[in-house]
Amino acid sequence: MLRLEVEREDDGRWIAEVVDLPGVQAYGATRQEAIERAKALSLRVLADRLEHGETVPEMGGVFAVLP
């Protein structure tokens, strides 16, 4: 399962970071927008890694949003 951490920045934007995929993070005007963008980016990164024969994190599910 990929874990997402979500925080509100000082400027009001939201950032969602995928803990299990270092460097994968996305901003949004709302919390939900940041989460959806991070999920979409994560799926692209995982597909790219699989396509190139790279390892991906072991997952029992897909996403868990952490408080």
Q: In which residue ranges do the predicted regions lie?
A:
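A short, exposed loop/beta-hairpin motif centered on an aromatic-Gly-Thr core
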Residues: 22-33
